[in-house]
Amino acid sequence: FAMGAVFYNQAVDNYLDEKMAPGSKTNDKPYKDGAYYTYKEHAWDEAFGYWGAVGHGLGLNAKQNYNITKMKDMAAADQNKDGVVDLKSEYNFAHAYYASSFDKGGKTNYYNTVTQAFLDGRKIIAGAKGEKLSSSEKAALQGHIATINANWEKVIAESVFKYAGSVYKDIVKLEENYSDKAFATYAKHWGELKGFAMALQ
């Protein structure tokens, strides 16, 4: 639930919404005195951080991105080959991890779609070189925002579907043969289901 109430909400309903809306802080001023990045760059980067994708994730396949979070493929995570995994830049978090978990089945491409839209949008903002965004740039940026929002929402919806199925199977098992272990599994899946469902509200 926290991922939805904080990460998802802050990204799509704040940084990619109010902060990118016409009339909000412009792109021709620094975020704050002494900052070398603009307000728009700051807001966009905040949203990307909430998505949780590793910096080099587009160069990896879905299984590798999934295994990074599961700590099963540290070689793929260690982009700079220094022998350690930097949690700030070489690790998948939050909904980006869940996206890769669905994508590895080969039927979706949420991780790459959202991450690429973030990168393409960032290029538009950076390409303005500290000047106000033009009408065409704003329109293009809104297109990337729409892509991000739609696919991020689908990741959460897929999670609801996944855990609803798990809860159903757990209930069947509990009815057939109750045990504390089976109930603990049910409770875990129920908590996941409730959290993801509430995130969509």
Residue ranges and their predicted role:
Residues 1-201:
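Mature extracytoplasmic or organellar-lumen-exposed domains after removal of signal/transit peptides
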